[in-house]
Amino acid sequence: MSIDSLPPLREVIERHDLMPKKSLGQNFLFDLNLTSKIARQAGDLRDQPVIEVGPGPGGLTRALLAQGAYVTAIERDDRCLEALAEIAAHYPGRLRIIAGDALEQDFTALFPEGPKPRIVANLPYNVGTQLLLNWLLVEPWPPFYSSMTLMFQREVAERIVAKLDSDHYGRLGVLAGWRTQAKIAFDVPPQAFTPPPKVMSSVVHIVPRETPLPCRAEALGQITQAAFGQRRKMLRQSLKSIGGAALLEKTGIDGTRRAETLSVEEFVALANACLP
């Protein structure tokens, strides 16, 4: 069944009264060329498992299925479930719909065997960053997914791929740089969405590193949260609540430096210094 044999998305949205909810961070994609481009960015999807978070009325879902994927779609907006069920009827056995909150989902339990899924999603803007942090800090590593192809606001995308000495370097850049290789694949203009957001969006492609620098994810998460939570303060002050003086002494890192001047390797050293 081709993507063109399904009713137009605008018709589906009107029939099911699916106006996007700001409270859920929803911005629906209508452009079939764009949804197909996002799906292609994830690689060859023929007979491959894919996790999609926040499918809404199913614009990207259609593109993923048309390219041969087996899709597990997680949607917390009950209004969208009937529209997704109609898509599932066109692709028997290829679309699994889970009604629920992705932030509460145990993703590692979704695919207990077989090839690792790819995560492909136009993430709801209000939970996208937290979901990414969860996926970057997940244990064990290598993770449950083989790659991530995700839509973010452009400013968030720049923070994900940021390197030391760049304006956008921060906690996301450290954690993504530690465990993955991330790149901005392409931009998506506001007019591609309904309703159009006020900012440009970007698709980011993320591939896990098989062997990142040895470090406890929980410790690195804590260190980066403290350091960048007060990024304008010196490290001896921003890390004070988590025993920063001892950590800085152990690692030989100057306490008068600020978080934005530390490399990924130096953050890993601080996290490892947390070990008893």
Swiss-Prot record:
UniProt key word Transferase: yes
Enzymatic reactions: adenosine(1518)/adenosine(1519) in 16S rRNA + 4 S-adenosyl-L-methionine = N(6)-dimethyladenosine(1518)/N(6)-dimethyladenosine(1519) in 16S rRNA + 4 S-adenosyl-L-homocysteine + 4 H(+)
Location in or out of the cell: Cytoplasm
Keywords (A to Z) from UniProt: Cytoplasm, Methyltransferase, RNA-binding, rRNA processing, S-adenosyl-L-methionine, Transferase
Domain of life of the native organism: Bacteria
GO molecular function, one term: RNA binding
SUPFAM superfamilies found in the cross-reference section: S-adenosyl-L-methionine-dependent methyltransferases (SSF53335)
Main location: cytoplasm
Annotated positions binding S-adenosyl-L-methionine: N27, L29, G54, E75, D101, N122
Annotated Gene Ontology cellular component terms: cytosol
EC number(s) from the headed UniProt entry: 2.1.1.182
Keyword Nucleus: no
InterPro entries (alphabetical): KsgA/Erm, rRNA_Ade_diMease-like_C, rRNA_Ade_Mease_Trfase_CS, rRNA_Ade_methylase_Trfase_N, rRNA_adenine_dimethylase, SAM-dependent_MTases_sf
Function: Specifically dimethylates two adjacent adenosines (A1518 and A1519) in the loop of a conserved hairpin near the 3'-end of 16S rRNA in the 30S particle. May play a critical role in biogenesis of 30S subunits.
Family the UniProt entry places it in: Belongs to the class I-like SAM-binding methyltransferase superfamily. rRNA adenine N(6)-methyltransferase family. RsmA subfamily.
The protein, known as: Ribosomal RNA small subunit methyltransferase A
Lineage of source species: Bacteria, Pseudomonadati, Pseudomonadota, Alphaproteobacteria, Hyphomicrobiales
Protein encoded by which gene: rsmA
